[in-house]
Design a protein with these regions (language model features):
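Noncatalytic, solvent-exposed loop/strand surfaces
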Residues: 1-228
């Protein structure tokens, strides 16, 4: 039951993101009183260590089933990275000091943005699929500068967080599932190395790779019937 084998319990504001654990911290994002929040908890006790508010220069259309704090944080050994569609990316150290921010958007996604950032090899990788002008961006985790950015013109609606894949031969890739296409991008340059057609319009779930096989699922219309 709820009172048995519970080490600690802490009340937090509402958010749809997942908590992320690293070292002695638990990081999460939340939305409360029109504020975009990043919160750090002590991993041993659940005590709140700090919370920081991101700027909110605009209010974007959002499906009532979504939340402005839907994307989950990402971490490396020194920093936590958060993405709010109504501002962009921000980086904090583990003590809550803001290191940089990278404004992005505005966005036009029917349900609101949902993909979380991914950190690999010093880069913060973020898929921003929307009705028009979709893109994939890599930002230097140390200074917030754009390492590369590539357009995704075929992507119209997706909320799936990408994954990193290391093939037996070749460089690490970012596997991105989006409207109608599954694609592999070189993390070093952003070049799209391969793609497979046949996906449906709404791709929502994180892909899984096992023994060299990618498993993906989605929801919506067939390839030639987008939006219906």
């Amino acid at each position: 039951g709820p009172e048995h084998n519970v080490i600690w319990k802490t009340s937090v504001p509402e958010g749809y993101s997942s908590p992320v654990l690293t070292q002695d911290r638990v990081f999460l994002t939340a939305f409360e009183d029109d504020r975009l929040l990043t919160i750090a908890l002590d991993r041993s006790t659940g005590r709140e260590l700090w919370r920081r508010e991101a700027p909110r220069p605009r209010v974007e259309r959002l499906d009532p089933r979504n939340n402005p704090a839907a994307p989950s944080p990402a971490v490396d050994d020194e920093r936590v990275y958060v993405f709010f569609a109504e501002f962009g990316l921000l980086a904090y150290d583990f003590d809550g000091n803001k290191l940089w921010d990278a404004p992005l958007g505005p966005f036009d996604n029917l349900y609101g943005m949902g993909a979380s950032p991914v950190v690999f090899d010093g880069k913060v990788l973020l898929v921003c699929d929307q009705r028009t002008d979709s893109f994939l961006i890599a930002i230097n985790g140390t200074n917030g500068q754009v390492a590369w950015r590539v357009d995704r013109p075929e992507a119209a609606s997706s909320h799936a967080t990408p994954i990193v894949w290391q093939p037996n031969n070749g460089e690490p890739q970012l596997i991105v599932v989006g409207s109608f296409l599954l694609s592999g991008y070189a993390i070093s340059t952003g070049q799209r190395l391969w793609w497979v057609r046949g996906m449906i319009h709404e791709m929502k779930s994180v892909p899984v790779i096992s023994n060299g096989i990618a498993y993906v699922n989605g929801y919506g219309s067939p390839l030639n019937d987008p939006g219906n």
